[in-house]
Regions:
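Short, Lys/Arg-rich, polar N-terminal cytosolic tail immediately upstream
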Residues: 2-4, 11-25
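Hydrophobic, aromatic-rich alpha-helical transmembrane segments
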Residues: 23-27, 31, 62-70, 98-107, ...
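Alpha-helical transmembrane segments
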Residues: 27-44, 109-116, 181-187
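Alpha-helical transmembrane segments in multi-pass membrane proteins
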Residues: 29-87, 135-137
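Juxtamembrane "helix-exit" motif on the non-cytosolic side of transmembrane helices
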Residues: 46-57, 124-128, 193-197
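Juxtamembrane helix-loop-helix connectors linking adjacent transmembrane helices
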Residues: 57-64, 89-158
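Structural signal for the C-terminal ends of transmembrane alpha-helices
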Residues: 81-91, 219-223
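Transmembrane helix-loop-helix hairpins at the membrane interface
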Residues: 122, 126, 144-247
Length: 247
């Protein structure tokens, strides 16, 4: 009887602790790790100096730029995979065991995010008379150089990196559901705009990018596996790249 009573108390205590963790606004350790990895993400382009110096590359053509980006992104993904290897292995099991349910949730949230993204882009383009986002123009230019390498780089590798940096890191840093979704989507949207903006009005493009980022965050929150958002992010990017190739 004492054993059963103790077991019930342990379960009750565990339930309370888990509930408290979910209600926490921030995780200091998670924030510190997130800041370090965000800086690594932001400075990862410097990894391109390795092949530039190693092969004594004098001229950076469009094709060379794509290959250098592929190199730095691959190295960055390997580093992130090593850092989060335990969590990634655990979440892969969750994703695999409930694949159909996770995929169904992912599709639903992606469609919602896509609709909001398309509507906001339409308003920005036709109502506010704004052109295409500078980031989109830059990506399409890179696709024109080495299209199928871009399928690998922007369609497969980049989504893995971005989901780990903008979703996994933020979920670890901000246990509160809505704080995680709002902050991760805002930063995700900002990073796709600020790095290539040409005027202050370009900041409005944070809305379409951020809405898609919010859908990725919500599907991760719902399924508890980063692979759901990685898969949907891959599908989204790959479709856009292929459409750009055949257009």
């Amino acid at each position: 009887m004492l054993f059963l009573k103790k077991e019930r108390e342990d379960k009750k205590g565990s339930f309370i602790m888990n509930k408290m963790k979910k209600n926490e606004l921030i995780n200091v350790k998670g924030i510190i790790i997130g800041i370090i990895l965000f800086l690594l993400f932001y400075c990862s382009s410097y990894l391109q100096l390795i092949p530039i110096l190693l092969f004594n590359i004098k001229e950076i053509t469009g094709s060379t730029q794509v290959l250098l980006s592929l190199f730095s992104n691959t190295i960055l993904l390997i580093i992130l995979a090593i850092i989060f290897r335990k969590e990634l292995i655990h979440e892969w099991k969750i994703f695999k065991d409930k694949f159909l349910a996770n995929f169904d949730i992912g599709i639903k949230y992606w469609i919602i995010g896509l609709i909001v993204m398309m509507v906001s882009n339409t308003i920005l383009t036709f109502v506010l008379k704004m052109g295409q986002a500078a980031n989109e123009q830059e990506v399409q230019k890179l696709i024109s150089y080495l299209p199928w390498i871009m399928v690998i780089n922007a369609g497969i590798i980049a989504p893995c990196i971005e989901e780990i940096v903008f979703r996994k890191c933020y979920k670890n840093a901000f246990p509160n559901k809505w704080l995680f979704i709002i902050l991760s989507s805002l930063v995700f949207g900002s990073m796709h705009v600020i790095t290539s903006m040409t005027s202050p009005m370009d900041l409005l493009f944070i809305i379409p990018y951020g809405s898609l980022g919010a859908s990725f965050a919500m599907m991760y929150q719902k399924t508890n596996t980063i692979y759901t958002s990685i898969l949907m992010h891959m599908i989204h990017n790959t479709i856009l790249i292929i459409l750009s190739i055949i257009a």
